[in-house]
Swiss-Prot record:
GO terms for cellular component: euchromatin; polytene chromosome; Set1C/COMPASS complex. Residues 1129-1145, 1205-1217 have a biased composition (Polar residues). SMART domains: N-SET, PostSET, RRM, SET. The lineage of its organism: Eukaryota, Metazoa, Ecdysozoa, Arthropoda, Hexapoda. Residues 291-300 have a biased composition (Basic residues). Residues 101-179 form the RRM domain. It is found in: Nucleus; Chromosome. Its main location: nucleus. A motif (RxxxRR motif) lies at residues 1473-1478. Residues 1625-1641 form the Post-SET domain. Its EC number is 2.1.1.354. PANTHER family: HISTONE-LYSINE N-METHYLTRANSFERASE SETD1 (PTHR45814:SF2). CDD domains: RRM_Set1 (cd12304), SET_SETD1 (cd19169). This is Histone-lysine N-methyltransferase SETD1.
Length: 1641
């Protein structure tokens, strides 16, 4: 157990312990351990503060709080209980004179309520109670109020302030009223005004007793008077003297209450009563007997116990229980009784409403006839049905639903009127027939056969319309009991199967002649201007019948056709209307069918179906108009389409599946396949397994069966009828405007479409005509297929979907997408893209990824079409020979259609393109491979043969030469698709081809020579990108000798960085042979047919190339002359005598031979180029072959040019960059890498320091380098991607250079004995600083710097040393002895470290910590740092303003001109606005609706432009001065909801759109300008902006408009405060304005 804290109980312990504890400190805690009264023990034992006094054997325990810690944790702080003193009520029990705190106000204005009255009391003290009294029956404001103040002072002040004062137009009577005596009298006189006219007995003051209060309470609890007659009679007998006057008074009270209830019933419960009446009447007709019993019960009950009698009982009990007390009523009780009375009144009103509604309808004249007829009919039907076997099964489907058409239309549809689902389409088979029935019972008991499918034998067609009328009259006489809307509508319904065949037959008759798309454009436009149109109107405009315009001035409204079925006048009138409609011809309206344009055939037969179409359109789109439209007499079109859709009986199926229902989608008059035949996208018909889903509901199907809601209410409401008429006129006007606008739009679109077609045809003809003429000069094949393939697609008919709906009389199978899908899509002006060609079947190459340049360079669609035409002509023009015309036409047709988009000229050898391959291509490849096999079998020494043999071989094997071109091209293209060996064996012919598909289309070996010339001419203009160069005459000089196709060589060539020529090739013979060939000129048009910019770029690049080539030639000629002079001097010197290889002459010859071998001319034979490796070592044997006529070309790829001058020194000149045109980008990059390679040792001695004698000893080194020439030269090929663009002639010269030393500098290192010395110097090289000796002038300038710049500590130290030195050397110099040294402070602080800046940092870039940017890399700049250095519009503007060349004219915008311009622009803006308002006022009265649609804000928009901003990316700048408080621009975008805005913001962040262009208008609308908007989206945030955003309302639309806060000058950036809400994740602000907050949020 735990110790208990208690100080007082310590004194109750035993005496023995008291003595021991007296000397010690008083303990705080104790615990009783044992007590002889509780357990068997000797004495009581206590433990104090965890210690047992006198007994140390007990363990020591630390005392703690004995309360449960969990309870302490859970226990809340105890809240203090506020006990309010009860209010002192002044009532009947108050003894003595009450305080004057009760104030009564009489003659209050009716509009004064408690809140207003409380505000009147503010200056008079606090009030305890405020009551404003209303009439207990009418709830009318009585103008009496009672106020109980807290103090008498406040009551006195209120009386003095407001007594006899006018408040809200009435003079108040304010006075103190103890116990409210005057108040009660006034209330009694106002509420019981008849009490003063009593006829019998004196006026008795009412007095309430305890018994009466108890009775009152029981009444209020139950809400109705007690029916216990015995108890009430006992009470009545005691006081009969007062019954008559009280009863007369309460009857008046009840009469007022009845009048008030009638008013509420009429005004507030009209629609609900009609609906409940529908429901009650339906139940009454279904359950006739029980309803009649209930009606008699209600009548008997109402006659037995009327409300008046029950209230008389209540009043008599009240009068009986009153005693003769002096006061009229206890005031407190009266207040409570008033609240109870209100509650009781609401109970009675709620109880009596349904009863009175029923009585109201039962007692109405027109429903008496319904009841009389229904009573007899229901008795007959009940008697008949109870005896039949079908009764049980029929009522098992749905409670109290009968198969009679009259009742099913009125009762069942009223049950489901809230869901607007017709019973035929109810999902759970509530109205389909039972499995026993197959026949639908009609009102005349005639058995009609069910709907028959197409394969059943059908009945003969119906009689003509004249006989239909007679037949209906006969039936009408029989069925006089049938309601009007059934009797009349039956005339339109022949038997169901006949109607099916009749409609099908009429449709088949009219189908061939009903294509309105055949009417030409002029006829359509003329008809439109005459008020007619072509074709059927779109469904969203077919809301009217054909006479909507002619009869719109006199709409005849009748709304009581359904409710009053025995009205013979209505019956005759509607029948006459329907008969008139059947024979009335259709007049052409703006939106009607165009049968008059095609031919007026069978007008009387077609009228029924046409009217059904129009009305089905009306019904299906009735949701677009108001639901409470009056039923206008559209010539009987309202009920003409009434049909009973036959419902198939449900099958006995598995009960766990959905219930099956009949097919409720199609009317019985139209076959089920009509919708699928006429609709392109018909609705999905619910299948057997999905029966619970309701089918489409259209009012044309369900409305005739339903009770006409709103008819009764509109009959007595003239205001509502007028409102509906006005709405009808407005709708008609809007329809006319919509028709006119749509017709106008369709005319414009059709005209533009025809113009666009005409333009495209003529453009294609103009483009293709010169090509065809040039192609006809070489190929005599017809070009008719081009015209076939250019425009073989028919323009889409804009009436296609409209006309698809013309013959559909049911819209039950409406478009599953909805109304928008049924609207015609207006044709757009976008270019129709050609379908991409199918993927070629025979492709053996690997698919390759496009590089960045290839993806960027894409061609337009029009160029692609042109390319299709041209390529097909190109393919055919190549084929000379007996090719059949039909075959070539078909091939060109296929090629024109299927060719893919070709890459532009800039992506020549790296883009992949394809065209359709034919069998001839593969045959040509077979021939090529055979020739190649024989070529590969030739001996290896073929490359070393002489020139004549090779020339003969090339002439004999032209196709092999073509293969050589392709091999070189494969080596030069940087793609990976040529890694396989067989890829290099394929021919290439087309211009942009880089893939295996573009194979040679040569059919005969005789065409090989033609192919070579075609390739050469094709390559001339393109090969600026490529490695295959052309000479200045455009002739291809690089038909190469075939390279041996070994894997090693292929791999080396593939790895090389620059294009490599083969070991030997011949140019001269091929030049001779190709010169006679004529270049096809159509290839150039194909190349440059991309766009105007591409052509301009190509021309500019061509001129640039020619200019650079000219400069290169001049420079090279000058260099060659200088080299020849130096060589001649060396040859003539006496020291150059040839003795042996080590002689000086031999060395000079070696140098000369090296120079010559590097400068071979382009006419050098391929065999000698082949033997370059041997010639470099032993070139002295054949040096006499070249002689002085050889031109020396000292070009190496960006390396040093070396020649020897007359002094025997080898000098080194650096070739200029542009002259190195032959070098590739990769070689230049490798040179940069070599120059900046920090791992190489520094060069101790430059090559220019070596004498010519040492330079000439380089034979062994040259041998080593010559062995590596092949590898070095192969490492200079460009990598994959976009090829280099080198001039043609420079490529030729570069290719003709002998040994390729591209990546290795030409090192002329010594040979023999000096090689170890050079190596020793390189190893032990120590770099040291070398300075030039200064002249005397510089020395003097440095000496006197202490006078010009100042003196530093080092200078002072040196001067002092010099002074002391002079003292020692010249001790007797008088001027030194008289001069004493004084320390001077330093004045030159140039080398001092700069002091640390306190505030602003330098705007320089961050310095690297190690001091070396190359090793550390670059530091990433902050956005703010980058903004200081990057270009933006304001910076360029500032630089321009500080420019010295800036003119000082007034356009330079000085302050004076600036202010002048601002005031001028402000005046112009205001004048424009006033003119605009004047124009709007003038046009508003007379103009069309389109004139008022333009945006008013366009007149007030300022001249703005967007440019690079210093704040963030793009910004908006003013191009004109803007005054303060002027509108700058409207913020335009999509108006979306906040939920959509959150989704879009997440989506934008996911796809990488970091900027936010969402602008909130209010809590429900956000403007999103991310993907569509205007220049306002570029406005940046600023913490000190010059504009502000404002939400204004224009034409009931909210718009965000940016206004200027201050005058804004030209080129000043427009900014405003974004006002982002505060968030944890901060967005840094980059505005840099004064007082910038640092963050946007």
């Amino acid at each position: 157990m735990q110790d208990v804290r208690n100080i007082n109980l310590v004194n109750n312990s035993s005496n023995s312990h008291d003595s021991s504890l007296a000397n010690s400190k008083m303990p705080r805690n104790f615990k009783l351990l044992s007590d002889p009264q509780l357990v068997k023990c000797g004495t009581r034992l206590y433990r104090y503060d965890g210690l047992m006094p006198g007994d140390p054997s007990y363990p020591t325990i630390t005392p703690r709080d004995p309360r449960n810690p969990l309870i302490r944790i859970r226990a809340r702080a105890v809240e203090p209980l506020m006990l309010l003193i009860p209010r002192f009520v002044i009532d009947s029990d108050y003894v003595g004179q009450p305080p004057a705190v009760e104030v009564t106000i009489v003659n209050l204005n009716d509009n004064i309520d408690k809140q207003f009255l409380a505000s009147m009391l503010d200056k008079c003290g606090t009030s305890d109670e405020i009551n404003i009294y209303h009439h207990p029956i009418t709830n009318k404001h009585l103008g009496i109020a009672r106020i109980v103040f807290d103090s008498t002072k406040g009551a006195r002040q209120f009386v003095e302030k407001y007594n006899q004062k006018s408040v809200m137009g009435k003079i108040l009577d304010v006075f103190c009223d103890p116990f409210g005596a005057t108040l009660k009298k006034s209330l009694e006189s106002l509420t019981n005004s008849v009490a003063g006219k009593q006829l019998i007995g004196p006026k008795v003051t009412p007095q309430w007793t305890f018994q009466q209060a108890a009775l009152e309470d029981t009444e209020f609890i139950h809400g109705y008077p007690e029916k216990n007659g015995e108890h009430i009679k006992d009470i009545y007998t005691t006081q009969t003297n007062h019954e008559i006057p009280n009863r007369s008074r309460d009857r008046n009270w009840n009469r007022d209450k009845e009048r008030e209830r009638d008013r509420h019933f009429k005004e507030r419960s009209r629609h609900s009563s009609e609906r409940s009446y529908d429901r009650d009447r339906g139940m009454r007709e279904n359950v006739g007997t029980s309803i009649r019993r209930r009606r008699t019960f209600y009548r008997r009950r109402s006659s037995d116990i009327s409300p008046e009698d029950s209230r008389d009982i209540l009043i008599m009990t009240r009068e009986r229980s009153r005693d003769s007390d002096s006061r009229p009523r206890d005031y407190c009780r009266s207040r409570e009784r008033e609240s109870f009375r209100d509650r009781k009144r609401s109970h009675e009103k709620g109880r009596d409403q349904p009863r009175e509604k029923r009585e109201h309808y039962y007692n109405s004249s027109k429903d008496r006839e319904y009841r009389g007829r229904d009573r007899d009919r229901s008795a007959e039907i009940d008697q008949r049905d109870r005896g039949s076997l079908k009764y049980c099964s029929r009522y098992s489907l749905h409670e109290y639903i009968e198969t009679d058409v009259r009742r099913s239309s009125n009762t069942i549809s009223s049950y489901y009127s809230a869901s607007s689902l017709p019973i035929a389409s109810h999902g759970f088979n509530s109205c389909s027939f039972p499995s026993i029935e197959n026949i639908k019972t009609w009102s005349d008991r005639r058995a009609w056969t069910a709907f028959q499918p197409d394969f059943h034998p059908v009945q003969p067609p119906p009689p003509p319309p004249e006989e239909i009328d007679n037949w209906d009259e006969e039936e009408h006489d029989k069925n006089s009991i049938v309601p009007t809307h059934y009797g009349c509508m039956a005339k339109l319904q022949p038997p169901v199967p006949s109607n099916v065949n009749f409609a099908t037959k009429l449709q088949s008759v009219t189908q061939p002649n009903s294509d309105p798309g055949t009417v030409d454009l002029d006829t359509r436009i003329a008809l439109i201007f005459k008020g007619k149109t072509f074709g059927n109107a779109p469904p969203f405009l077919q809301m009217d019948s054909s006479d909507s315009e002619t009869d719109q001035g006199k709409p005849e409204v009748f709304s009581d056709v359904n409710s009053d079925s025995n009205n013979s006048e209505n019956k005759k009138r509607s029948c006459e209307k329907n008969n008139k409609v059947l024979h009335q011809p259709n007049e052409a309206s703006d939106i009607s069918s165009d049968e008059e344009l095609i031919g007026k055939k069978d007008k009387s037969k077609l009228s029924l179906i046409c009217e059904k179409e129009v009305n089905d359109d009306n019904m299906s789109l009735s949701s677009l108009s108001s639901q409470e439209d009056p039923i206008q007499t559209k010539e009987g079109a309202e009920y003409k389409s009434i049909m009973s859709s036959y419902m198939y009986s449900h099958s006995n199926q598995n009960p766990f599946y959905y219930h099956a229902s009949g097919y409720g989608h199609y009317l019985s008059g139209i076959p089920s396949e009509s919708a699928s035949r006429l609709f392109s996208n018909g609705a999905y018909v619910h299948s057997e397994y999905l029966k619970a889903v309701a089918s489409f509901n259209f009012d044309s199907f369900s409305k005739p069966y339903d009770y006409n809601k709103g008819a009764l209410s509109d009959q007595n409401d003239g205001i509502r009828q007028k409102v509906k008429q006005v709405i009808g006129y407005i709708v008609e006007e809007l329809k006319q405007i919509l028709k006119r606008d749509v017709n106008k739009r369709m005319i414009e679109i059709t005209a533009f479409k025809h113009f666009e077609t005409w333009w495209d045809e003529h453009t294609s003809k103009a483009r293709s005509k010169p090509l065809f003429e040039k192609a006809d000069s070489t190929v005599n094949t017809p070009l008719n297929c081009i015209k076939d393939t250019s425009y073989n697609e028919k323009n889409p008919d804009i009436n296609l979907l409209i006309n698809a709906h013309r013959e559909v009389a049911d819209f039950q199978s409406y478009s599953s997408i909805g109304l928008r899908a049924a609207m015609p899509k207006l044709p757009s002006f976008r270019r129709i893209r050609k379908h991409p060609s199918p993927i070629p079947t025979k492709r053996n190459f690997l698919e390759r990824d496009l590089s960045d340049q290839e993806e960027m360079v894409q061609r337009s669609d029009s160029d692609k079409e042109d390319s299709n035409v041209e390529i097909s002509d190109t393919a055919r023009s190549k084929i000379k020979g007996p090719v059949p015309i039909q075959e070539s036409d078909s091939k060109s047709h296929t090629s024109g259609l299927n060719s893919k988009r070709k890459g532009s000229a800039s992506s020549f050898f790296s883009s992949s393109s394809s065209s359709t391959s034919s069998e001839a291509e593969y045959e040509a490849i077979d021939c090529v491979e055979k020739a190649r096999t024989s070529e590969e079998d030739s001996p290896r020494g073929y490359g070393q043969r002489n020139l004549n043999q090779r020339t003969t071989t090339i002439r004999n094997r032209n196709l092999v030469g073509t293969m050589d071109v392709i091999n070189v091209r494969n080596l030069c293209s940087g793609s990976n698709e040529f890694k396989k060996e067989n890829v290099t064996k394929r021919t290439k012919k087309n211009i942009y081809s880089d893939t295996d598909e573009d194979n040679d289309r040569t059919l005969f070996p005789a065409l090989k020579e033609k192919n070579i010339s075609t390739i050469l001419s094709d390559l001339e203009e393109i090969s600026k990108d490529s490695c295959i160069g052309l000479d200045e005459n455009g002739i291809e000089p690089t038909i190469l000798r075939k390279i041996p196709n070994t894997p090693k060589l292929n791999e080396e060539c593939r790895r090389s960085l620059t294009p490599v020529p083969p070991p030997g090739y011949n140019e001269e013979e091929i030049k001779k042979k190709v010169d006679c060939k004529q270049k096809p000129s159509f290839e150039y048009d194909r190349i440059y047919s991309d766009s105007e910019e591409e052509k301009e770029y190509q021309e500019r690049r061509k001129r640039n190339t020619e200019y650079m080539a000219q400069m290169e030639r001049e420079f090279l000629e000058e260099q060659e002359k200088r080299i020849e002079k130096s060589l001649d001097k060396n040859l003539q010197s006496p020291n150059n005598i040839v003795k042996n290889n080590n002689s000086p002459r031999n060395k000079n010859d070696e140098t000369r031979k090296t120079a010559i071998s590097q400068t071979r001319s382009c006419f050098e034979s391929a065999s000698k180029v082949d033997t370059t490796l041997v010639n470099i070592i032993s070139v002295e044997n054949d040096i006499n072959e070249f002689g002085p006529h050889e031109e020396g070309d000292v070009l190496t790829n960006g390396c040093n040019k070396m020649y020897t001058n007359s002094k025997g020194k080898t000098k080194r000149t650096q070739s200029p960059v542009y002259s190195e045109g032959g070098s590739s980008q990769a070689s230049q990059a490798s040179q940069v890498a070599l120059e900046h390679c920090y791992s190489l040792p520094p060069h101790s001695v430059s090559l220019g320091d070596y004498p010519s004698g040492k330079v000439n000893e380089t034979k062994n080194i040259l041998k080593r380098e010559a062995e590596n020439i092949a590898i070095v030269s192969q490492m200079t090929r460009t990598g994959p991607g976009r090829p280099r663009k080198d001039p043609i002639c420079i490529q030729k010269k570069k290719r003709d250079l002998a040994p390729r030393m591209s990546n290795v500098k030409s090192k002329m290192t010594p040979n023999g004995d000096e090689w170890p010395d050079l190596a020793h110097k390189n190893v032990h090289f120590v770099p040291c600083d070398m300075y030039k000796t200064r002249d005397q002038n510089e020395e003097m300038v440095i000496l006197y710097t202490f006078l010009t710049k100042g003196i530093d500590a080092e200078d002072i130290n040196f001067i002092k040393m010099s002074y002391l030195d002079h003292l020692h050397k010249e001790p007797y110099a008088m001027f030194l002895n008289n001069t004493h040294w004084v320390d001077h402070c330093t004045t030159d602080r140039a080398f001092w470290p700069p002091p640390s800046k306190k505030r602003r940092k330098d705007d320089e870039l961050i310095r690297h910590k190690t001091g070396c940017a190359r090793t550390e890399g670059f530091y990433k700049l902050d956005v703010r740092e980058k903004a200081k250095h990057k270009y933006h519009y304001a910076k360029a503007n500032t630089e321009d303003s500080f420019n010295e060349d800036r003119s000082d004219e007034p356009t330079a915008l000085t302050n004076h001109h600036h202010n002048k311009l601002i005031s001028k622009m402000q005046g112009i803006s205001r004048e424009a606005r006033s003119n605009q308002r004047r124009l709007l006022t003038a046009f508003g009265s007379m103009g069309e609706s389109e004139l008022l649609k333009f945006n008013q804000l366009k007149f007030r928009k300022k001249q703005l432009k967007f440019a690079k901003s210093a704040i963030h990316d793009w910004g908006l700048f003013a191009m004109e001065p803007i005054a303060a408080d002027e509108m700058v621009i409207e913020y335009v975008g999509q108006m979306i909801r906040p939920v959509v805005a959150d989704l879009r913001e997440t989506k934008y962040e996911a796809i990488g759109i970091g900027s936010s262009y969402l602008f909130r208008i209010d809590m429900e609308t956000i403007i999103d300008a991310t993907k569509c908007g205007n220049l306002a989206r570029f406005i940046n945030h600023s913490c000190n902006p010059n504009c502000y955003a404002k939400v204004i309302t224009i034409e009931s639309e909210k718009k965000i408009v940016i206004y200027s806060k201050q005058p804004i000058g030209i080129n000043e950036e427009i900014t405003y405060d974004y006002k982002f809400p505060l968030e944890d994740e901060k967005i840094p602000c980059l505005c840099g304005a004064q007082g910038c907050r640092g963050t946007l949020n």
